[in-house]
């Protein structure tokens, strides 16, 4: 028996209880979570809003959790030098058999036959212990990084998305005539933890960074936005920003997205990351299509990331952890016990990122 936070996918619901999970006869690594992160995907599952989520075969429940920093309890000899006492981040997606999955790019799975821990057919990390293979773990060498390393999983999404941007933006000369992005504007829709991580990375690219939402934000969020030299505006009260070169959406709301697509500069790039199957429909007419075509605007979706993106995420989190007064740590706004399952259905006030402390 193991204590776990579970749902019944795709129907939803959440509870913590002791459950029977078959233990492998042979395993490389036994892990205990230290912190697990909570995000919109977890809440969507609990509310029954993610129709693509499903239980692990053979079980009438699914253990939640795909963001985690864990400590190794036991480990057999392995080529990755993972040993007891190490801190590691487990990779979420597990490969199927398509060509991309076979080369470690399950983030670009060609046929959808992959699994995602805590989401699609594979138990997640919100439990007292679990087993895994060493190849699915990313080691955290700096013990001062343990808490902030819970942000590795969402940060790897950002690394992948900017890699996509690098590829797509090569269709034309994207930079200004000084060969930089210093005169280019990046607008990020949303003010959740993922949006902030996108803002951190956009700043690395030397964009002028803007964050927007349909409502005012609290003083803590405004303070962080200012600290990273970004700007915020409430698009329902202020004139829409014009002249956008890179638009990143974390909301999944089509009406909001197309509000700003119509403000894109020539050769602009739109990265669609947020998902929200319950978002209302929006109207798109021929002029919108003309606008996109005549300006060579690229709209591209980006999901998940490969193991290499986890490694890059750790590098940037280390940099941000030791720079600018460790402002990255301020994204973690609440630490809760596993029994506090109410946070899955009621978002804490002024939340950016809530995490669960397991030990």
Curated annotation (Swiss-Prot):
Optimum pH is 6.5 for the oxidation of D-glucose by NADP(+). At the physiological pH of 4.6 found in the cytoplasm of Picrophilus cells, the enzyme shows merely 10% of its maximal activity. One of its GO terms (molecular function) is galactose binding. It catalyses: D-glucose + NADP(+) = D-glucono-1,5-lactone + NADPH + H(+); D-galactose + NADP(+) = D-galactono-1,5-lactone + NADPH + H(+). Belongs to the zinc-containing alcohol dehydrogenase family. Glucose 1-dehydrogenase subfamily. This is Glucose/galactose 1-dehydrogenase. It is an enzyme of class 1 (oxidoreductase). Keywords: Carbohydrate metabolism, Metal-binding, NAD, NADP, Nucleotide-binding, Oxidoreductase, Zinc. GO terms for biological process: galactose catabolic process via D-galactonate; non-phosphorylated glucose catabolic process; protein tetramerization. Homotetramer. Substrate binds at residues 41, 116, 153, 157, 304. InterPro entries: ADH-like_N (IPR013154), Glc_1-DH_arc (IPR026583), Glu_dehyd_C (IPR031640), GroES-like_sf (IPR011032), NAD(P)-bd_dom_sf (IPR036291), Zn_alcohol_dh (IPR050129). It comes from Picrophilus torridus (strain ATCC 700027 / DSM 9790 / JCM 10055 / NBRC 100828 / KAW 2/3). HAMAP family: Glucose_DH. Its cofactor is Zn(2+).
């Amino acid at each position: 028996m193991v204590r776990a936070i579970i749902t019944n996918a795709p129907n939803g619901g959440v509870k913590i209880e002791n459950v029977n999970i078959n233990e492998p006869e042979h395993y490389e690594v036994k892990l205990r979570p230290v912190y697990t992160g909570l995000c919109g995907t977890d809440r969507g599952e609990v509310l029954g809003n993610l129709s693509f989520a499903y239980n692990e075969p053979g079980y009438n429940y699914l253990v939640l959790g795909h963001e985690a920093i864990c400590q190794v309890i036991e480990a057999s000899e392995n080529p990755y030098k993972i040993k007891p006492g190490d801190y590691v981040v487990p990779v979420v997606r597990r490969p199927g058999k398509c060509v991309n999955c076979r080369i470690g790019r399950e983030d670009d799975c060609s046929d959808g036959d992959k699994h995602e821990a805590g989401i699609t057919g594979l138990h997640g990390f919100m439990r007292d212990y679990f087993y895994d293979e060493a190849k699915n773990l990313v080691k955290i060498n700096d013990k001062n990084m343990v808490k902030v390393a819970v942000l590795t999983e969402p940060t790897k999404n950002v690394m992948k998305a900017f890699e996509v941007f690098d590829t797509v933006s090569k269709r034309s000369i994207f930079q200004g005539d000084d060969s930089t992005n210093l005169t280019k504007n990046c607008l990020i829709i949303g003010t959740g933890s993922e949006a902030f991580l996108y803002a951190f990375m956009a700043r690395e690219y030397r964009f002028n960074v803007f964050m927007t939402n349909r409502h005012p934000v609290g003083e803590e969020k405004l303070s962080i936005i200012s600290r990273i030299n970004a700007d915020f505006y409430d698009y329902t009260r202020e004139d829409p920003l014009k002249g956008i070169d890179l638009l990143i959406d974390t909301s999944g709301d089509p009406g909001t997205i197309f509000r700003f697509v119509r403000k894109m500069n020539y050769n602009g790039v739109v990265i669609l990351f947020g998902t929200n199957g319950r978002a209302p429909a929006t109207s798109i007419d021929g002029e919108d299509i003309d606008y996109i075509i005549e300006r060579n605007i690229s709209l591209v979706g980006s999901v998940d990331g490969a193991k290499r993106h986890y490694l890059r995420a750790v590098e940037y989190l280390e940099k941000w952890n030791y720079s600018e007064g460790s402002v990255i740590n301020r994204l973690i706004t609440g630490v809760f016990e596993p029994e506090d399952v109410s946070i899955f259905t009621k978002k804490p006030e002024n939340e950016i990122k809530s995490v669960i402390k397991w030990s």
